[in-house]
Amino acid sequence: MPASRIISLQASPDDLPPMLRRNQRRPWSEQQTAEQGLPEPAAPETLSWKRHLLRLLVAACALMAEGGAWSDQPQEIKIGYLRQAPSKIRISLIDVPAGNDGLAGAHLATEDDNATGRFLNQHYAVVEKLLGEGDDAVAAMNALADQGASFIVTSLDADRLLQVADAGRTRSVTLINALALDERLREQDCRANVIHVAPTRAMLADALAQYLVWKKWTKWMLLTGSHDNDALFADALRHAATRFGAKIVEQREFKDNGGARRTDSGVAEIQRQMPVVTQGAPEHDVLVAADESEVFAGYLPYRTWDARPVAGSAGLVPTTWNAAFDQWGAVQLQNRFTKAYQRPMTAHDMQVWTAVRMIGEAGARGGSAEPGKMLAYMKSPEFSVAAFKGQKLTLRDWNLQLRQPILLFDGRNTVSVSPQEGFLHQVSALDTLGLDRPETKCRLK
């Protein structure tokens, strides 16, 4: 859009053409509500969304009033989505990911982008590449770039993500990480062309630790798996315990020796094994499990030697989303998703949804569909995105990690949302989750 055509979105109803202005209702007042028995006004988040649409409409009307501001064809903004096939290995069959896990979130977010983008003559579309185990991630990224995708949302492991990020520099491609939790991607291996929507393990561990400390469950027994990712989550939990004043009274490792857990004798074997693994531990308030590999943690609740709650990779689990979350207007998104895809919305779906919405917000509020200007706005202090979390989400400028509340889920209900009350920060309470600016090793390059 030429600079002379950019219209301020900070408009009021008085800026509308007379035809539209006549239909504007006057503001609610407490006296009207009380005396006339009128319904309560919409929630603040709903009103904010309506104001946002109104501003976009004002801009559109102003452009049309200038005469011929719209072209016949909208500006096409291609959003790439590069994903690897998810592992189907889960302890519980109900947790096996759907084939469109993540992709469904991308498509739903594109609908939301277009709901506002049409007022600015913008059209968003997702182009996708699914990687098999031996497929070349860099070649897939280049194929998406060849289709016009300057922003590519990724659901890749850390090693593949770094390969794509380094190769993407020559294509002026910006990646938005929606899956990898690895701290190193935001620290010593950070990249200036990678934005992170997926939380870090430290953010998840800190969110859990804050709640356990708030509950005064400060004596933890830590049981960790034998795989590399399990060790990384265990490190994050140990750091969180030290940071917030909990004490790990004992650490044990659960060796993954394989085995056929779904044989006819599997349930009986697990019932005998889990108490033995946890027997003889010092006095503790909670058993904290680090088992990203889905080997043992799901079997711990109700099977431990001592009657203790389980948290971490099972029991009370920190996550960015769950199908039961219904606060701050989230039920509307949950219902839309379930109606469209006939399944619950997962945390991965939500992370991809948020990534695609960030691109749409940058295009709508940044005043341009040009990728460089969109990226500059996304990295600016003015940028934020609403994601049904009760507050606007922003980027940490030192490592491009999205600040966000973390939900604590017990399998059926959202037990709490961190950061917890009383954990303060001089900039944002959200910065109590994960490594803070003084701790970072990131030098964006």
Question: What label would you give each PLM region?
Answer:
Residues 2-7, 15, 23, 48, ...:
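Extracytosolic ligand-binding ectodomains
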Residues 24-31, 35-36, 40-41, 45:
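Intrinsically disordered, low-complexity segments used as extracellular stalks/linkers
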Residues 37, 67-68:
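Residue-identity detector for glycine
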Residues 45-56:
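Bacterial N-terminal signal peptides that target proteins for export
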Residues 55-65:
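Bacterial N-terminal signal peptides
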